[in-house]
């Protein structure tokens, strides 16, 4: 993907991103803003992934290691899967522990665009006050993600 230098470090999500509706595991449509509000008070690691994405699946063991090292962090998984069935099957199959949401549409749709999504897996780290501290990390950046989390304590 293209690397957009202007977007390498945003400290907050755009209005557009926050207004976007995503689907919760119990099939409710909820705005991204409401999702983030639910988890305020703790740092968040958010991963955009999909069950069809080979790199996402390959990175899952690293994600699990990150979770083991940082148990006090909230983990949000936003999937780009095409159907609810494929999404839920993927969560089961790869035993992904965390809070799960389904994005309506793909990488180039409005939510993907609002997050400057050019690659998945994509990781975003948010501090306990809701400020973005790492806007664009990918599967080769786990060390950076871990260091960022450690610096938040």
Stretches found by the model and what they are:
Residues 1-21:
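N-terminal targeting signals for export/organelle localization
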Residues 22-44, 61:
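A short beta-strand-turn-helix
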Residues 40, 48-65:
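Conserved redox-active cysteine motifs that mediate thiol-disulfide chemistry
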Residues 42, 72, 97-98:
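A generic structural signal for alpha->beta connector loops
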Residues 45-46, 75:
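Hydrophobic beta-strand anchors of alpha/beta hydrolase catalytic cores
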Residues 58, 96, 103-150:
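Thiol/disulfide oxidoreductase modules built on the thioredoxin-like
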Residues 58-94, 107-112:
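Structural microenvironment flanking redox-active thiols in thiol-disulfide oxidoreductases
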Residues 79-82, 101, 123:
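Nucleotide-sugar donor-binding/catalytic module of glycosyltransferases
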């Amino acid at each position: 993907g293209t690397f957009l230098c202007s977007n390498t470090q945003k400290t907050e999500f755009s209005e557009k991103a926050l207004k976007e509706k995503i689907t919760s595991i119990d099939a409710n449509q909820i705005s991204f803003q409401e999702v983030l509000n639910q988890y305020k008070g703790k740092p968040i690691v958010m991963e955009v992934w999909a069950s069809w994405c080979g790199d996402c699946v390959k990175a899952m063991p690293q994600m699990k290691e990150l979770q083991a090292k940082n148990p006090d962090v909230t983990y949000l998984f936003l999937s780009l899967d095409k159907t609810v069935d494929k999404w839920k099957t993927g969560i089961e199959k790869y035993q992904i522990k965390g809070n799960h949401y389904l994005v309506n549409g793909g990488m180039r749709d409005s939510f993907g665009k609002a997050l400057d999504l050019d690659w998945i897996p994509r990781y975003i780290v948010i501090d306990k006050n809701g400020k973005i501290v790492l806007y664009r990390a990918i599967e080769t950046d786990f060390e950076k993600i871990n260091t960022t989390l450690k610096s938040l304590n």
